[in-house]
């Protein structure tokens, strides 16, 4: 687990085996702190923490001792005044870090450019913050076949391919990913990836060929035409019957 104040915590999943209807306490948070991300690990991963001011620290999770459910955790990263952690990623999630700033700029940087160090440090610069870029809003570990979604403060969403994003060095700003109106910023980012297994496992045995599709469309059009004629004939017959009833009712009124 990681909090915005740079605290990290590692707890065995077995500690959460018996969850009550009202839930279980997962972590004790310090004042003004909040949980930002949770990852399932194997106790062998390198962890990346990235802050809104463009700092990044990489350390191995073995540096984080395992603690109980209600513990606070330990310091993962020392932050400067006003800074906060915006994302936690693991090396197994991707070969690069995609970092996006609030004014719609972003870049990919190889994870290998970040040297592992002991937890609790200030990290290294991972993004050049300027007035043009704004602060960092999110980070995702990605591979070239991944796709990303960006959502703005106005609720606009775009989807981009990681392969179309520029691969840049550690101490650089990004390139334009989305055009934003004045006073609109990127609110959040997410990684999406096509599940090829769904396509591979799809049953295509009942799919029609191109000729069968044309034949089916022709039959459907002919049936629709017949239905239209039948409906017209039925309407004419119904109208004729109603007129006959009206004439009969008029005759009865005259006899009375």
Show the residue positions of the predicted features.
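C-terminal interaction appendages of subunits in large macromolecular complexes
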Residues: 1-256
């Amino acid at each position: 687990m990681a909090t915005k104040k740079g605290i990290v915590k590692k707890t065995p999943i077995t500690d959460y085996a018996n969850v009550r209807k009202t839930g279980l306490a997962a972590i004790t948070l310090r004042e003004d702190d909040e949980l930002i991300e949770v990852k399932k690990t194997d106790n062998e991963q390198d962890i990346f923490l990235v802050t809104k001011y463009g700092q990044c620290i990489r350390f191995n999770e073995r540096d984080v001792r395992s603690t109980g459910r209600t513990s606070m955790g330990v310091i993962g990263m020392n932050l400067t005044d006003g800074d906060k952690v915006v994302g936690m990623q693991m090396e197994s999630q991707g070969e690069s870090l995609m970092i996006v700033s609030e004014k719609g700029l972003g870049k990919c940087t190889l994870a290998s450019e970040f040297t592992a160090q002991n937890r609790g440090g200030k990290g290294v610069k991972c993004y050049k913050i300027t007035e043009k870029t704004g602060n960092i809003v999110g980070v995702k570990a990605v591979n070239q076949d991944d796709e990303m979604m960006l959502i703005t403060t106005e609720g606009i969403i775009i989807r981009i391919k990681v392969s179309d994003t520029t691969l840049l060095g550690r101490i650089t700003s990004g390139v334009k990913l989305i055009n934003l109106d004045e006073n609109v910023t990127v609110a959040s980012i997410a990684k999406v990836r096509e599940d090829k297994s769904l396509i591979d496992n799809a049953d295509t045995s009942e799919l029609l060929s191109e000729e069968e599709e044309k034949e089916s469309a022709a039959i459907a059009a002919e049936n629709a035409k017949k239905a239209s004629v039948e409906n017209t004939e039925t309407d004419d017959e119904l109208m004729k019957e109603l007129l006959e009833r009206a004439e009969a009712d008029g005759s009865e009124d005259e006899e009375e």
